[in-house]
């Protein structure tokens, strides 16, 4: 397999970053993406490598649907921009980032209100906190924001125990993201009755097949989301969503517009709120426009691959 590194600016700061970097790898089955965030060490990156290898060399399970419903993603922007993002998305569900650095509670309320107004009464609004609140703040803010009829609240607090306590104290469903994808034991969310919904992301979980196994073991409704990837990475998320037996919620896979560019001539963009289930091919010209020196990413990939091989050699529980 050969790899090529990329760096693509984001339109708006997202998860504290302004540029999305990674590596695209081509194998017998097609293209795979390896794009763990900068703070992740080799052991955490190992699962991202496994997902990339699966996409490039093994391919994905057969789909059970041809399209995947998706939500608009609204970063920490002002209310006017939030409304514009939703109106131009074609989606009837929106996920709104709240509790971001530099944003006040008043900013969050105004953003969620603007999204609700843009969607109308039949649209669905969910918020994503990325674990930023403590329990009491979470309970207070969820009750405050639920006047906009929240579909669910994603990762209001950082720990599983906190999620469980918040879930007991509010009526809005709770979704777990970081407590699944960054956990040594992702099933603890289920065992602690800490969530109503689980958010699964292909790269952090080690691939489509690994995520399907986790979904089956967990037994909770699943939302598939992206890790702010190019169309290559998004195609893996679409493959997971397409292979799930049930898909009760819109998925967080319409994130390509967060990037200033893509690597495909035919990018994975939603039409009328859905994404098609398909592989993508990388455009040589578009990749060349965002390509960077691969040395640092080759080193990260090699370390992740070595860590994955070590994990594979370890005895099971």
Swiss-Prot record:
* Organism superkingdom: Bacteria
Q: Which UniProt keywords are present, listed alphabetically?
A: Lyase, Magnesium, Menaquinone biosynthesis, Metal-binding
Residues binding 2-succinylbenzoate, per UniProt? 71-73, 95, 128-130, 201
Example GO biological process: menaquinone biosynthetic process
Its EC top class is lyase
Question: EC number(s)?
Answer: 4.2.1.113
InterPro entries cross-referenced by the UniProt entry: Enolase-like_C_sf, Enolase_C-like, Mandel_Rmase/mucon_lact_enz_CS, Mandelate_racemase_C, OSB_synthase_MenC1
* Residues that coordinate or bind Mg(2+): 128, 154, 177
User: Which cofactors is this protein said to need?
Assistant: a divalent metal cation
Q: Quote the PANTHER family the UniProt record gives.
A: O-SUCCINYLBENZOATE SYNTHASE, O-SUCCINYLBENZOATE SYNTHASE-RELATED
Complexes and interactors: Monomer.
Q: What is this protein called?
A: o-succinylbenzoate synthase
The protein's organism comes out as Thermobifida fusca (strain YX)
Q: Which gene encodes it?
A: menC
């Amino acid at each position: 397999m050969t790899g090529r590194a990329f760096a693509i600016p984001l339109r708006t700061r997202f998860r504290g970053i302004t540029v999305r970097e990674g590596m695209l790898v081509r194998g017998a089955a097609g293209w795979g993406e390896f794009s763990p965030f900068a703070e992740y060490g080799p052991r955490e990156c190992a699962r991202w490598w496994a997902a990339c290898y699966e996409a490039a060399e093994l391919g994905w399970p057969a789909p059970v649907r041809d399209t995947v419903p998706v939500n608009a993603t609204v970063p920490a922007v002002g209310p006017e921009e939030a409304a514009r993002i939703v109106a131009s998305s074609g989606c009837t569900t929106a996920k709104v980032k709240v509790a971001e650095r530099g944003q006040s509670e008043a900013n969050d309320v105004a953003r969620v209100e603007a999204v609700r107004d843009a969607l109308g009464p039949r649209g669905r609004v969910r918020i994503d906190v990325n674990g930023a609140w403590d329990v009491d703040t979470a309970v207070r803010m969820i009750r405050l924001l639920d006047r906009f009829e929240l579909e669910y609240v994603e990762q209001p607090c950082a720990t599983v125990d906190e999620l469980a306590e918040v879930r007991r104290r509010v009526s809005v469903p709770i979704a777990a993201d970081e407590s699944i994808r960054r956990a040594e034991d992702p099933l603890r969310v289920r065992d602690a009755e800490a969530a109503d919904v689980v958010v699964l992301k292909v790269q952090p979980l080690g691939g489509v097949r690994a995520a399907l196994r986790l979904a089956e073991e967990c037994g909770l409704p699943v939302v598939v989301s992206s890790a702010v990837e190019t169309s290559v990475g998004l195609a893996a998320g679409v493959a997971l969503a397409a292979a799930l037996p049930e898909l009760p919620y819109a998925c967080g896979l319409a994130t390509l517009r967060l990037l200033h560019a893509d690597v495909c001539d035919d990018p994975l963009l939603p039409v009328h709120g859905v994404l098609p289930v398909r592989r993508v091919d990388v455009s040589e010209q578009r990749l060349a426009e965002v390509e960077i020196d691969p040395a640092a990413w080759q080193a990260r990939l090699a370390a992740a691959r070595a860590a994955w091989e070590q994990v594979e050699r370890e005895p099971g529980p």
